[in-house]
A protein has these predicted regions:
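Conserved SAM-binding motif I beta-strand of class I
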Residues: 45-50
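Conserved beta-strand signature within the Rossmann-like core of class I S-adenosyl-L-methionine
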Residues: 26, 118, 125-136
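Class I S-adenosyl-L-methionine
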Residues: 140-184
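Mobile active-site "lid"/loop adjacent to the S-adenosyl-L-methionine
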Residues: 95-118
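A short acidic, Gly/Pro-enriched loop at the edge of an enzyme's catalytic core
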Residues: 17-20, 84-94
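Helix-to-beta-strand junctions that scaffold the AdoMet/dcAdoMet cofactor pocket
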Residues: 17, 40-41, 126-128
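S-adenosyl-L-methionine
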Residues: 1-20, 34, 38, 56-89
């Protein structure tokens, strides 16, 4: 069976540029933050966002334990406020929507309203040949609603400026899926 996490990184890898700027808009336990930190290298910059202190602490501990390059800024704030922190064009941006894995609190999730703002702003900030990956988890109510909202929103972007793709296991409607947005 296809591993969606591996597939996501296969799409992102050709867009990575040493010394560029990347963002993990939903830091969670720091998996993507760590991967981006290593990929961007010592001269790159990685911004990571989460609204939960637990996510920030877990990510910081992981980055330190894994001896990640000191190229990251961990931000305890909503990804919808990304423009307050990121001033440079983005090479790569990653969203893993939903709730904090392992927290046991499935009631605290990303929300359509803030996700819409964050995704719109992140797309606007993409550098030429930049890429944005958005993983959606429709197995819970808000995740399904976020997926519908993103389908509608992303389908309206000009094909002359962006390539927007969706990857989904079509015979498993509650399985995670993801969008890839590439700026031309």
């Amino acid at each position: 069976m296809i591993d969606l996490l591996t597939l996501q990184k296969d799409f992102i890898t050709p867009h990575l540029k040493e010394g560029a700027v990347a963002a993990d808009f939903t830091m969670g336990n720091g998996n993507d933050t760590l991967w981006l930190s290593r990929a961007m290298g010592e001269n790159g910059k990685v911004y990571a966002f989460d609204i939960q202190e637990k996510a920030l602490e877990s990510t910081r501990a992981r980055l330190e334990a894994e001896s990640a390059p000191q190229n990251y800024t961990l931000i305890l704030d909503s990804h919808s406020n990304l423009k307050q922190y990121i001033k440079e064009p983005l090479c790569v941006g990653m969203f893993n929507l939903g709730y904090l894995p392992g927290s046991g609190n499935k009631a605290l999730t990303t929300l359509r309203e803030t996700t819409r703002v964050a995704v719109t702003d992140a797309i606007e900030m993409l550098d030429h040949d930049g890429i944005l990956m958005i993983a959606v988890y429709p197995g819970h109510e808000e995740g399904a609603l976020e997926g519908e909202m993103l389908d509608e929103m992303l389908s309206k972007y000009s094909r002359f400026q962006y390539c927007v793709s969706k990857f989904r296991i079509i015979n498993s409607p509650t399985s995670p899926f993801f969008f890839i947005i590439e700026r031309k």
